[in-house]
Amino acid sequence: MIDKSPVLLTTERLHLMLLPPDAAERVLAYHVANKDHLGPVSPARPATFFSPAYWRTRLAQDREDFRYDVSLRVFLLPKGQPLALAPIIGNATLAHIRRGPLQAADLGYGLDHRHEGKGLMTEALRAFCDFAFSAMGLHRLQANHLPENLRSAAVLRRLGFIPEGYARDFLLINGKWRDHVLNSLVAPAEPGLRGGP
């Protein structure tokens, strides 16, 4: 069976895709270029994180995780370039998908530092959240950020996320337990009717 990794979502300026293992070099290039930018706000990474082999395995696992409704990781690619060659400029993940009476997932995301301030993450996450609610049938998304990460807080506010609390020593980042602001977004009565620009 040939795996063509179809585009999951398209926005005005972006494609959001579940990538195949042969995209490992492009994913690695994104992470290497943003090591100093995303590292300080990310949990510890395995020693092999910055290797093509790690990403080939991880991308194969991502496809299985989506198939079995465990998680969904998409990468952001700018429109206007062939999909097989387009650089990766960000990512978004629905992790820890929980079904049954909860119907929830944890939202995570990152953007290449060279593309910040253009509204791309808001654009991507608006489409991704709508997909989570409509196509995936989720009811609630949770997204947490470091208190000092004002850029991430602003993105979440624009999407309609509501702060729900403050968790002390919530996540181990760079060897230190860090506090996080807890936020959530509940599915609208009619998908696609959330928040403004």
Task: Put a short name on every predicted segment.
Residues 37-61:
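Conserved GNAT-fold acetyl-CoA-binding loop/helix
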Residues 65-69:
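Soluble sensory domains of the PAS superfamily and closely related sensory modules
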Residues 60-64, 130:
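Surface-exposed alpha-helical segments enriched in charged/polar residues
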Residues 1-26, 30-40, 75-197:
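Acyl-donor (CoA/ACP) binding surface of acyl/acetyltransferases
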